[in-house]
Structure formats: structure tokens, C-alpha cells
Amino acid sequence: MTLRIFDSASRQLRDFVPLREGRASVYLCGATVQSAPHIGHLRSGVAFDILRNWLTYMGLDVAFIRNVTDIDDKILNKAAEHNRPWWEWAATYEREFQWAYDQLGVTPPSLEPHATGHVPEMIEYMQRIIDAGHGYAVDGNVYLSPMSLPDYGSLSGQKLDEMDQGESAGTGKRDPRDFTLWKAAKPGEPSWDTPWGRGRPGWHLECTTMATKYLGAEFDIHAGGLDLKFPHHENEIAQAHAAGDGFARYWMHNGWVTMAGEKMSKSLGNVLSVPNLLQIVRPVELRYYLGSAHYRSMLEFSEDALREAAAGYRRLEKFVHAASSVAGKNDRTLGRSEVTDAFTDAMNDDIGVPAALAEVHKVVRSSNSRLDAARRGDSDAVESVVSAGEQVRAMLGVLGVDPLDEKWQEIAAESGAEHDALDTLVRAELDIRAKARAEKDWATADAVRDRLAAAGIVVTDTPSGAEWELSEQ
């Protein structure tokens, strides 16, 4: 089955055929580093990291660009409100975004260009638009006229006579529907020299310029949040077409994280930060939660849903560790094999993570029944459990949540001292229990087990001794 993705521009599922054989090119609108990231921002990073992983698994060499918008009205306004240099403000929150991406195991992009590093290219791009008759300069501002482009509005379905660019009328606009490519300099704001006077770039121009610089005039996929479809992505297309570039061949948009049915946003005061949520669940569990819904669907946040997802992940993790233990006791290493056919079909159906996860859980459920026999050394059971474990690792690897992946081991190591301390205490209790069992002191053995259960610790007896884990409740 060929990968099919829902193209927002054509509003239909389309077979994904890369522009260049064996390669895939993806541009993701990254962060505007105006304030701390919340999980609404991070959902996009996780969703399209999974896309990237699947393209890579399919054997494609993926060029993945995720930009940083480090000059913007909101950045300037917030920096001014707090009496801080704009560049320092942007750098501070860029570091916070990077930390959050790292915590959630998001693979770094192939390149992460910054808007402020591409002003010469933006000036050149504007000149092409003006030369083609689609743009004009007035009093240091540069505008683009959507009315000059017959396909304007095709992505978002916006009607020209009803659209609102969400910006002020501007000095010298010929039509209120025209949008800004370049903003004339204002006192106290950063600015750069151009043939039309000093100023700074508009948001839309930044992305079109960087996407085409690194991926070419035409590339495969442009991705981003649903809220960016208009005006941002519509205007990116307009700029590219005005300059004569074909631009993105497929458009993918992820749904919002919502609370009480409303989009998570700072303006509504319903923001959940990554550090706060990591007080409730581990980073890998938060990633699992954010990636578990279909990328195009809305994800309604609740703490109960987050905890439920974390419990679901722990069931998968428990099996992988058990399979790894079985492999180790039989002088084998639990690697990664191939994903199942059902998993492949799910992922090829518009990156259908819910169906893909259902397949992972199915494999785990069917294999758990053979764990006891495998622990006893039954050769058929060992082979079955290890084979299933390697399949599960492969599938979870595509989703970015393989429990044995080094990145999760490194992140877990940050809090490893706490786990080691707990393990020492639990092992002391288990030693008491083991001694009592050897002496047939069942009352003491049961009392130890009950104490541990009351503390949320589940004990499992295996041929090689007792093992413990935290309860899923």
C-alpha cells in the first residue's frame, strides 16, 4: 500500500509521490519565540516528527526544515513591556522551546534557520515579487496584492471580498486586502537596509524565503498547525507564486489541543506548560499522549486522559522490558525487526496513529500470555516473545516512544537517582520477603507484599526472583 496523506489544499487523500525519487522534503512552521511553549505548540512538533520517522522507515532520505521566527510584532511588544532587548527575549524562549522538544524526544531538524539570518534572501525575494508586478513599495513598506493572483484563497477557501488579513491598513496600501511583506522602520525597533528604506520583515515573507532557500522552488510537504492555514500559509503560497515558484506540493495541518472545546492559547488563559505536565507524567508518556490521536483531529486535554494514556504506555513498556529480560537470559539482545503489515497499513493511511497503536497493543496482549513460559525457558515461547518484542520496538520506534531508545534512557537518567533510591528501599523489603518465604513464614511474606501494594508497588514472582514495578493506578 502506498502512503496516502490528506492534502489540505486539494481537500482529499492523495498518494504521496516524492518530487525526487528516494528523497522527501518537508518544511514545518516552527516556533515564534515570544513566550514559553505549551503542549499546543508541542503537538505540531510531535505529529510531524512521527511523519518524518515514517518517511525514514519507508527508506526515504528526509530533508526536514523547521524554522525559528525570532523577529515578530509579539516578540518586540513583549520585550518592550518587560524592558528587555528583543534579541535576548527571543533567545530566552528559543532555549525553552528547544528544551521542550528535547524532553519529548523530537528529532532535531536537518536545519533550523532563523528569520533574522535571512534578510538578504528576503530582500531578493521581494524584488522578484515587485518585478513580476504583484508587489509594490510605499513609504518604506512593501505589500503584495492578492487580487493579482487568480488562485489566491485556494488553500483556505477564503473569499477575497470577505477576507481579513488581521493587520492594520498600513501606510499607502492600494487595497485593504493587500498584505505586508516588509514593515518600515519605527523608532526603537530593529531594522535592516533595503532598496525601499530601512525596516524589518513580515512574518509570511520569512517562511517562504527560508523554505525555498533550503528545499528549492518546489518541494514535497509543508506542515503546520491548523490555525496557520489563513492568513499565514495562504500568504506563503501567494508570495511563492508571485515570485514564480511552485512551492509545496502537499499541505498537512495538525489539529489543536483544546480545553473545554476551546483552542489552547495564552490569550484564553488555558495554557498548560511542559514543565507542569512533567510533574504528572514522564516525558515519554507526555509524548505518547500528544501523538496518540490522529494528527488532524482535535485533542481535548484532561488530566484523566493524560494519566490514562500514560498507563497505556506503561503496559507497552512493561512488555518490552519483559521481552528484553527474556532475550538477555537466553544470550540474545532485543533489537528491532520489521513492523507488522497492519501497522504499515495504518501508517500509510494518512499517518493513522490510532489504528497503528491499536495494532501495537494487540501484539502485546497476544504475547503476554507466553511470558511465563518464556521465563521458564520454553524455547518456542522464548522465540515468540522475543520476536514480538522486536516488532513492538520497531513500531514504537516509528512513533518515537521505544522504551529502549537511548534518548529515553538519557532523559530518564536525569531523574535516575530517585529511581535508584526507591529501588534500594524496595529491594530491602523484597529481601525480607524472600527470607520469610524460604522459612515458610507466609504471614511475614504476605505482610511485606501488602505494604508494597499499599505504596503502589506491584510485585511479580519470576523463576529468577521477584521483580517490582509501579502500579498503573
From Swiss-Prot:
Key word Metal-binding present: yes
Sorted keywords for this record are: Aminoacyl-tRNA synthetase, ATP-binding, Cytoplasm, Ligase, Metal-binding, Nucleotide-binding, Protein biosynthesis, Zinc
GO terms for cellular component: cytosol
The free-text note explaining how the cofactor binds reads: Binds 1 zinc ion per subunit.
Major place of residence:
cytoplasm
- Kindly list the biological process annotations in GO that this record carries: cysteinyl-tRNA aminoacylation
- Motif extent ('KMSKS' region): 263-267
What cofactor does this protein call for?
Zn(2+)
In the record, the note on similarity to other proteins reads: Belongs to the class-I aminoacyl-tRNA synthetase family.
Q: What's the protein called, per UniProt? A: Cysteine--tRNA ligase
What is the originating organism of this protein? Corynebacterium kroppenstedtii (strain DSM 44385 / JCM 11950 / CIP 105744 / CCUG 35717)
